[in-house]
């Protein structure tokens, strides 16, 4: 929505755009305004060809596995969809020879356990999960390519942020959905995992 409001032509990718539902684009009312294409971000040729065909000025990498708990069950998926995919995109940009701004979605999970101290850009990384390790690795790849090739490559370190579009497996959506079920009489208890975990949330 933000980029569209700035007059951008926005192209969104999915592994299989022809069968993907793009539910969130529909909920936001921008489904018809975004061009949808198929890209496998783990495949160099797929990414390279897309960049050559569509010639973007900017690339925003928001893809990849996004659950800390799931990353322990599927650690390889975390590495491939975050670290490997970031490297492939960076290398594809470099190989085209085009000047393209690149934004990578980072994560506060890079910091890991900060002993209850707030984290900022000067805080050392100490990731504690496959997800955090993958995001930290991607961060360093972006920094390395930026320094080496002198291009506008950056990582935004995102802390927990909430949205009605967030999947139901995340804690806030889980709480809301269970409260609705309790109100409707289909549930009578709310089950949560580690209730000692502390998080800040943005919107």
Short names for language-model regions:
Residues 1-161:
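N-terminal Rossmann-like NAD(P)+-binding domain of SDR-like oxidoreductases, especially those catalyzing
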Residues 115-118, 140-203:
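NAD(P)-dependent short-chain dehydrogenase/reductase
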């Amino acid at each position: 929505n933000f980029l569209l409001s700035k007059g951008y032509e926005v192209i969104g990718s999915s592994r299989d755009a022809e069968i993907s539902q793009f539910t969130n684009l529909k909920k936001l009312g921008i489904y018809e305004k975004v061009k949808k294409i198929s890209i496998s971000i783990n495949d160099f040729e797929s990414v390279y060809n897309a960049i050559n065909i569509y010639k973007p000025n900017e690339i925003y990498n928001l893809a990849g596995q996004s659950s800390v708990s799931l990353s322990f069950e599927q650690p390889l998926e975390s590495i491939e969809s975050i670290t490997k995919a970031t490297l492939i995109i960076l290398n594809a940009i470099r190989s085209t020879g085009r000047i393209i701004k690149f934004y990578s979605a980072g994560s506060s999970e890079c910091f890991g356990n900060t002993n209850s101290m707030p984290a900022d850009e000067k805080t050392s990384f100490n990731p504690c999960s496959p997800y955090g390790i993958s995001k930290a690795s991607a961060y360093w790849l972006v920094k390395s390519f930026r320094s080496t090739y002198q291009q506008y490559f950056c990582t935004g370190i995102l802390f927990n942020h909430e949205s009605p579009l967030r999947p139901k497996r995340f804690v806030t959506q889980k709480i809301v959905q269970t409260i609705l079920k309790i109100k409707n009489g289909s549930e009578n208890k709310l089950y949560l995992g580690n209730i000692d975990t502390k998080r800040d949330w943005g919107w």
